């Protein structure tokens, strides 16, 4: 507490009566503005002392008012007094003023920040602790920030963020936030990576017994990787229902991946006993191929994606790539062309890139930007050819040639049958799958057959089947419908899902040609002017992106399965166990047997647009009433678990909640 008995004149600055501590409350008229502010300050201190608090040890409202009173006073006393209490504000705790304490907290927090970055009001991934209202407030400005490429990655090299053993480097994040302009999905999985290929690169020839000459060459590597390329990895069934019922279009904008809480363990075998010990010095190699310098790994429809269920362990797949068409590099009969191709086979070693080596308890992060099209969720309720008023007569006439003779006539076209300038989209339907059951040959195939090469296995050996090439045409056979399995290979529970028509009038089109007496179907429709169509409708089970090949030329890019083709999709994040050699008598290639587990979180910002309609009538929406019943006792609904913990997968296309089936659009 301050002294009860003050000094007669106080400890004031020379020439002042109140500018200083312990002076009397009544010491005559103040000499100037600074002295007058000091007198008011002393009276406020006296009131605080009477309330039982010590104003000298805490920054308080009287100090704040004194600083404000002297903000435009440039006298010597004013400068000294103001500077003193500004210093007190910076270092002393606040007295009974939570707002001031919070500002002081932010003052020190901001002082530890790095360099300023350009402002951008777009919500960022990593908003785990934000409320939905706070995310709603983060609306974008008129122009989005400049992005250098569509799928770059930002991550430190040479040492990740970390902490000591026993201290977490991040918490579990999950859930989604929905606003008018953005949706943020957050997911975390426990992953496990182990030693692959004995830390070696190997060339493997894949020659199935039933492939009819189809074979493949693969370079298998000691690396594994993360694949986030599927909607079901990010949206729960309810979140996907929310998205497709309320938004007319959406697309990914940013993705943030964090790999943390690493635990590296050594496997020790002693006879029948196996012990798992923490290894605090072993490491894992991690890097992101943001420039796509290595062969693509995140191929659409692969099984290696992040598990749908948050409690499932993500066992990372081994990375491998195809270096050459195997049939063209066998060098049969000393073929000169095949020898030239074989001599050009590339060999990619991922250790040829800078990367981090992390230990137990450390973490790393990567951020990606997307540059892609919108996924449109609206269905056309009429085709473009019916965009007219059928009650109004037309000035158009048509020429009619009579069958069997040279007579002809002109007649006015009826108001309800006006012609259109808009044609169906392109597609190919004049083929069927080739080969016996289990064949790997598709209905359409693209081959590479260099002049002079010896191809003995047939075109299947140098060809690649491609997705059902129906374009926007109505599939005539099952060969032209996209099908997939919901269950992993080898589970003996294969049940394929067949895509159904979305009932959009800009899909499932057909082109017919008249010949005086009837119309004939044109199975193959090429690219022409004025073709109008919608992209293939996706479901929650579809991939998000596919990498557009690097080429000199291309036509319109429209993947047959509705994925987003990107020049720069998110770079693949590679990971492998560090090789720790151990001595041996004969210098054999021996090493510690270790593995790594940890958490990986993936947060994506999706740009969205809510639907708005003038349609009076209710529209169809995805509901739980369209789902099925399954499980061990056939009493559990889709997207639930049975008594054995088995997850009930959807069994039909409609259960996967496809887009372009609910919201009507005006063309």
Swiss-Prot record:
Root EC class: hydrolase
Q: What is this protein called?
A: Minor capsid protein VP1
Q: Which GO terms describe its molecular function?
A: phospholipase A2 activity; structural molecule activity
The source organism is Human bocavirus 2
Q: Where is this region: Phospholipase A2-like?
A: 11-66
Q: Where is the signal peptide?
A: none
The domain of life is Viruses
Provide the GO biological process annotations: lipid catabolic process
């Amino acid at each position: 507490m301050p002294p009860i008995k003050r000094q007669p004149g106080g400890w004031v600055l020379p020439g002042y009566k109140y500018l200083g501590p312990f002076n009397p409350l009544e010491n005559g008229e103040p000499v100037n503005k600074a002295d007058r502010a000091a007198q008011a300050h002393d009276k406020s201190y006296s009131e605080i002392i009477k309330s039982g608090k010590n104003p000298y040890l805490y920054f308080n409202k009287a100090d704040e008012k004194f600083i404000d009173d002297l903000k435009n006073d440039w006298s010597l006393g004013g400068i000294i007094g103001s500077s003193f209490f500004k210093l007190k504000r910076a270092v002393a705790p606040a007295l009974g003023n939570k707002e001031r304490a919070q500002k002081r907290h932010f003052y020190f927090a901001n002082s530890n920040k790095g360099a300023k970055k350009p402002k951008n009001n777009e919500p960022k991934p990593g908003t785990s602790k934000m409320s939905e209202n706070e995310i709603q407030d983060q609306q974008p400005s008129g122009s989005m920030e400049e992005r250098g490429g569509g799928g770059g990655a930002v991550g430190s090299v040479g040492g990740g963020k970390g902490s000591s053993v026993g201290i977490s480097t991040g918490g579990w994040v999950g859930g989604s936030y929905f606003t008018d302009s953005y949706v943020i999905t957050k997911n975390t999985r426990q992953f496990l990576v182990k030693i692959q290929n004995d830390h070696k690169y190997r060339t493997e020839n894949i020659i199935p017994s039933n492939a009819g000459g189809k074979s493949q060459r693969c370079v298998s590597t000691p690396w594994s990787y993360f694949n986030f390329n599927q909607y079901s990895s990010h949206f729960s069934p309810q979140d996907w229902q929310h998205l497709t019922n309320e938004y007319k279009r959406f697309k990914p904008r940013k993705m943030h991946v964090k790999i943390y809480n690493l635990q590296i363990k050594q496997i020790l075998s002693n006879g029948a006993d196996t012990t798992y010990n923490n290894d605090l010095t072993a490491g894992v190699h991690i890097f992101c191929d943001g420039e796509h310098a290595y062969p693509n790994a995140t191929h659409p429809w692969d099984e290696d994606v992040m598990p749908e269920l948050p409690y499932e362990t993500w066992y990372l797949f081994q990375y491998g790539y195809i270096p050459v068409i195997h049939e063209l590099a066998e060098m049969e009969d000393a073929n000169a062309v095949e020898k030239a191709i074989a001599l050009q086979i590339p060999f990619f070693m991922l250790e040829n890139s800078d990367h981090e080596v992390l230990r137990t308890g450390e973490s790393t992060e990567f951020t990606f930007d997307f540059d892609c099209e919108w996924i449109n969720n609206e269905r056309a309720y009429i085709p473009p050819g019916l965009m007219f008023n059928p009650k109004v007569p037309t000035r158009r006439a048509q020429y009619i040639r009579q069958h069997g003779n040279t007579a002809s006539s002109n007649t006015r076209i009826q108001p309800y049958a006006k012609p259109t300038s808009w044609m169906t989209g392109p597609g190919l339907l004049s083929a069927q799958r080739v080969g016996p059951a289990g064949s790997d040959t598709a209905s359409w195939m693209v081959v590479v057959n260099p002049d002079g090469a010896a191809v003995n296995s047939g075109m299947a050996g140098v060809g690649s089947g491609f997705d059902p090439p129906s374009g926007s045409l109505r599939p005539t056979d099952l060969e032209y419908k996209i099908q997939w399995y919901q269950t992993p290979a080898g589970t003996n529970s294969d049940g394929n899902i067949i895509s159904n028509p979305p009932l959009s009038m800009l899909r499932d089109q057909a082109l017919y040609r008249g010949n005086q007496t009837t119309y004939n179907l044109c199975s193959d429709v090429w690219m022409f002017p004025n073709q109008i169509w919608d992209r293939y409708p996706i479901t929650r089970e579809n991939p998000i992106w596919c990498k557009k090949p690097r080429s000199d030329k291309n036509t319109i890019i429209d993947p047959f399965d509705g994925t987003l083709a990107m020049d720069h999709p998110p770079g693949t994040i590679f990971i492998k166990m560090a090789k720790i050699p151990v001595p041996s008598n004969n210098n054999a290639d021996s090493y510690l047997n270790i593995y790594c587990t940890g958490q990986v979180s993936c947060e994506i910002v999706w740009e969205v647009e809510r639907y708005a309609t003038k349609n009076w009538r209710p529209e169809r929406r995805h509901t739980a009433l369209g789902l099925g019943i399954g499980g061990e006792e056939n009493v559990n609904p889709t997207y639930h678990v049975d008594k054995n913990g088995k997850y009930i997968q959807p069994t039909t296309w409609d259960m996967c909640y496809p887009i372009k089936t609910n919201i009507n659009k005006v063309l």
